[in-house]
């Protein structure tokens, strides 16, 4: 069959704040897929440079010189309103603005990008990594999210998957995925805690596992706590120290800030294995006296002091999770560490103090979540048998009722999928309509919780206050995404909605973004093809000039002149930035003329064979080896005065060695 078949594999993607990772089930085992750059994780960074969109390592490499157009840690903004991200905005060098309906947007070059679009670019990179490995198109995925992500953030992540061209079969919490990876081959019943401190969020989940059943008992966390915050305390310290030394405030210099961010991240990582680290940033800035260099020493003890408040913030969620699970710390059999920040020795000490045991360091904190996502993909695809995952919702869901009160319908840590119904009524006589305001959170008053949606139930028949019977149904699917309906018993009139992300992405906007992503993919492909044609033309010029130089005595002067003319045509096309077709045409013409070198030399060899006494001594067997290729050399080619291998048109030119 010539038609390329789509993969039956459901890939697992850990869409992280700092790094992302993709995995797939192979032969009953989850395998992390290495990227085209040769890495097992990819930076979750997207940059815009001219007409190019860079993702991953290429985006990270140019961040220092292009901080305003390099978007990192955008996961901290997904599914959130501008009013909710005040602390996050202060930590990024790029512009964050409020969209038309209060959404977070990133203005760049006159366009406004949403966090979903940026997340989609990272997911496209993960998708392409999997496709390159599997050798077939991939359309289905399981994507992980922090356990403490609310409904809006989960729905936004699913939308990002759709924009990337993926059918998101399941959204699962990161700690749950880690538990799957850890417990898939474990025998016996165990209660485990998953302590997940990543780049942007902190989660703690308590699970019971046994006989292939993974049941989440409780979850808690802080979506405003992660590795970025630890970087920030180092950056703040560096700025203060430099100001003391030089009297210069680096906080207003975006390029310097990006360099400090990179230095802070490097120092943080090094201090997990060393007691101190040197921070050297030459030419960080300059004043009237010349360039200034930043040179500092940061000890592990001082870093722990700087970050002590952040580490302390992990304690309360752990204690709440244990209380919600109705367990004592001594009931926990194993504690898994997930997320890069869990490598910090002070963090591990806190985990030990909370749970009274050494945490398990047997899983790779950077890869275990993607591995778990791939296992869940295997479960959904039928490749993994006898595994049942019972997850929970992290926060209570309810509606606003009379007096601005939050009335919960589904309590936090309820196992999903689930459906809950409750009867409500009107607050005034002959009330023709009710507005259902859907809330998520744990506070008693509606205004203190997060509004995740609202809709109206209209045309209620006139009746005294309290008489109409309005049945409100909350239906939560396996992704933890909420569907709400309200039905008037008297009229049978019903209104239902799927709670959209608070980012406010409507279906037509998602479709536009899907089309934009596809269009960008095509444009990127064209740009790559154009670049390949230019590079090939440039190589062709080099090879043609080398062939003329090396074999000038063996080919007619007229042919040399023809080839030189064609070389100039290609060079002019490149210099004038001619269309790709014109460059290719000129390059192909040069290629055809280069083949004439072989023909001329074979003709000369025939003549030489007929009159060996009169002409130069040319071995016809050697000439049979002469050939020319339009392709660049492959493998290792050696070159010397006596022995030279040039690949030029499906034929290799080999000079006869001088004995």
Curated annotation (Swiss-Prot):
Domain of life, source organism: Bacteria
Stimuli inducing this protein: By stress conditions e.g. heat shock.
UniProt keyword ATP-binding present: yes
PROSITE patterns from the UniProt entry: HSP70_1, HSP70_2, HSP70_3
Keywords, in A-Z order: ATP-binding, Chaperone, Nucleotide-binding, Phosphoprotein, Stress response
Keyword Transmembrane annotated: no
A GO molecular-function annotation: ATP binding
Phosphothreonine modified-residue sites: 201
Compositionally biased residues, Basic and acidic residues: 571-592
Residue spans of biased composition, Low complexity class: 600-613
UniProt-listed Pfam families: HSP70
Region span, Disordered: 571-659
HAMAP family: DnaK
Physiological role: Acts as a chaperone.
Family: Belongs to the heat shock protein 70 family.
Protein name: Chaperone protein DnaK
Origin species: Chlamydia abortus (strain DSM 27085 / S26/3) (Chlamydophila abortus)
């Amino acid at each position: 069959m010539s038609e390329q078949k789509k993969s039956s594999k459901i890939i697992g993607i850990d869409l992280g704040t700092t790094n992302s990772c993709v995995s797939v089930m192979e032969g009953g085992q989850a395998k992390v897929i290495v990227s085209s750059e040769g890495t097992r994780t990819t930076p979750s960074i997207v940059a815009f440079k001219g007409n190019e969109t860079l993702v991953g390592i290429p985006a990270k490499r140019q961040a220092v010189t292009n901080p305003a157009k390099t978007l990192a840690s955008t996961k901290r903004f997904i599914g959130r309103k501008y009013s909710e991200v005040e602390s996050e905005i202060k930590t990024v060098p790029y512009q964050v603005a409020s969209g038309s309906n209060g959404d977070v947007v990133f203005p760049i070059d006159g366009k406004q990008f949403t966090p979903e679009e940026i997340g989609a670019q990272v997911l496209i990179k993960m998708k392409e990594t999997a496709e390159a490995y599997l050798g077939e198109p991939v359309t289905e995925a399981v994507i992980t999210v922090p356990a403490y992500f609310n409904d809006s953030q989960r729905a936004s992540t699913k939308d990002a998957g759709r924009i990337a061209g993926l059918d998101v079969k399941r959204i699962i919490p990161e700690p749950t995925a880690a538990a799957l990876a850890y417990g898939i081959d474990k025998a016996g019943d165990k209660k485990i805690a998953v302590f997940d401190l990543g780049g942007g969020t902190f989660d703690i989940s308590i699970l019971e596992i046994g006989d292939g059943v993974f049941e989440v008992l409780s979850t808690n966390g802080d979506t405003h706590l992660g590795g970025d915050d630890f970087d920030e305390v180092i950056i703040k310290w560096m700025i203060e120290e430099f100001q003391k030394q030089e009297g210069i405030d680096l906080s207003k210099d975006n390029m310097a800030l990006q360099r400090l961010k990179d230095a802070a991240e490097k120092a943080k990582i090094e201090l997990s294995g060393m007691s101190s680290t040197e921070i050297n940033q030459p030419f960080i800035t300059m004043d009237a006296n010349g360039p200034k260099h930043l040179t500092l020493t940061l000890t592990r003890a001082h870093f722990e002091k700087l970050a002590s408040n952040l580490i302390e913030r992990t304690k309360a969620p752990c204690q709440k999770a244990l209380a919600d699970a109705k367990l004592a710390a001594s009931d926990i059999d194993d504690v898994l560490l997930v997320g890069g920040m869990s490598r910090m020795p002070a963090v591990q000490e806190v985990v030990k103090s909370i749970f009274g045991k050494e945490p398990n360091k047997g899983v790779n904190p950077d890869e275990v979540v993607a591995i778990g996502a791939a296992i869940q993909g295997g479960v959904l695809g039928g490749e993994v048998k006898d595994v049942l995952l019972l997850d929970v919702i992290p926060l209570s869901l309810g509606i606003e009722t009379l007096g601005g009160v939050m009335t919960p319908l589904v309590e936090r840590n309820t196992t999903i999928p689930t459906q809950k119904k409750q009867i409500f009524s009107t607050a005034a006589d002959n009330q023709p309509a009710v507005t259902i305001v859907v809330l998520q959170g744990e506070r008693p008053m509606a205004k203190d919780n997060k509004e995740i949606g609202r809709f109206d139930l209209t045309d209620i028949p006139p009746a005294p206050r309290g008489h109409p019977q309005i049945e409100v149904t909350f239906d939560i699917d396996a992704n933890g995404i909420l569907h709400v309906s309200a039905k008037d018993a008297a009229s049978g009139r019903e209104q239902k909605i799927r709670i959209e992300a608070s980012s406010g992405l409507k279906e037509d906007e998602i479709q536009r973004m899907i089309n934009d992503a596809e269009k960008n993919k095509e444009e990127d492909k064209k740009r790559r093809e154009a670049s390949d044609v230019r590079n090939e033309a440039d190589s062709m010029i080099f090879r043609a000039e080398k062939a003329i130089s090396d074999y000038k005595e063996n080919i007619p002067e007229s042919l040399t002149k023809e080839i030189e003319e064609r070389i100039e045509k290609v060079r002019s096309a490149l210099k004038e930035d001619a269309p790709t077709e014109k460059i290719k045409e000129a390059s192909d013409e040069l290629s055809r003329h280069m083949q004439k070198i072989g023909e001329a030399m074979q003709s000369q060899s025939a003549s030489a064979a007929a009159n060996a006494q009169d002409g130069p001594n040319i071995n016809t067997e050697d000439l049979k080896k002469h050939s020319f290729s339009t392709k660049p050399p492959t493998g290792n080619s050696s070159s010397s005065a006596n022995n030279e291998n040039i690949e030029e048109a499906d034929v290799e030119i080999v000079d006869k060695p001088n004995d």
